């Protein structure tokens, strides 16, 4: 894995110093990471044993995650419990702040019957200079079955997958600018369940800070694999990654043109913690130029969905009347996140069991 994306001292390295070019992704570092993802993710049967990123997976594999997630809803649309991880231990390692992702993972793990440990990174030995590798090796000695990791460095989850013993599954809860695969899959599940048309007939617009967003990268990859008719990205040029046109998306700097006839409008927040300095003079200036307002929603299809991965800044990326309006599925995304994370955890654990059975027989 590229050492520019992850080294043994990554736990002490901030995103801003990891690589001066990382914010200009889709760059060569991202390409190298994506190219190497599929091998460690899958067992010999092509089933997940880690979940590190969307790239390298097939349409059938993404649909399998969606269908598995749907199996955790009853006939009334309520989530059910399923003891598929009973006896397993899951450790949640969040080196970055998180509300929705960490909490929904924990709920998912408990609904599956797992023993759940939330590691307090702020009080861990990484604060005393311990490397990520040494932290990892010490935690795996405590006989965990699954690590769920979020880290500020691109490639952290991949690094962990190559460093842990083969019987531990790694789930990527978001790594730097690189990827947020479970967010992408809960977005795909939401579109699958709520959109009035199949993926192949949809036009999806992603609006906001594309340049620094791991969500945008993973969503674009998933939408392309699932065969969406058209993907649009809408942002000021300063918030667009170099070379994004090569990924088959249509680029708009004018939101009023970009949202016309869209089936899905997906807002993103400005990632100020990754930028280091504000790119807009004031939030009201950004809202005026790029906010998702009722007037802009009206330019999309009449039954268009409004989505946002959160955290959501009302009056900056989106109007409150839109976020709380009839076309918003934002809270459904959160609930779907539990089902998707249940699916990924269950599938990765099953894939690990198959992998271990094969190793034992050879």
Curated annotation (Swiss-Prot):
One of its GO terms (molecular function) is aspartate carbamoyltransferase activity. This is Aspartate carbamoyltransferase catalytic subunit. It comes from Psychrobacter sp. (strain PRwf-1). The gene is pyrB. Keywords: Pyrimidine biosynthesis, Transferase. Belongs to the aspartate/ornithine carbamoyltransferase superfamily. ATCase family. Residues 1-22 are annotated as: Disordered. Its EC number is 2.1.3.2. It is an enzyme of class 2 (transferase). The keyword Transferase applies. One of its GO terms (cellular component) is cytosol. Coiled coil: none annotated. It comes from the Bacteria. L-aspartate binds at residues 128, 214, 269.
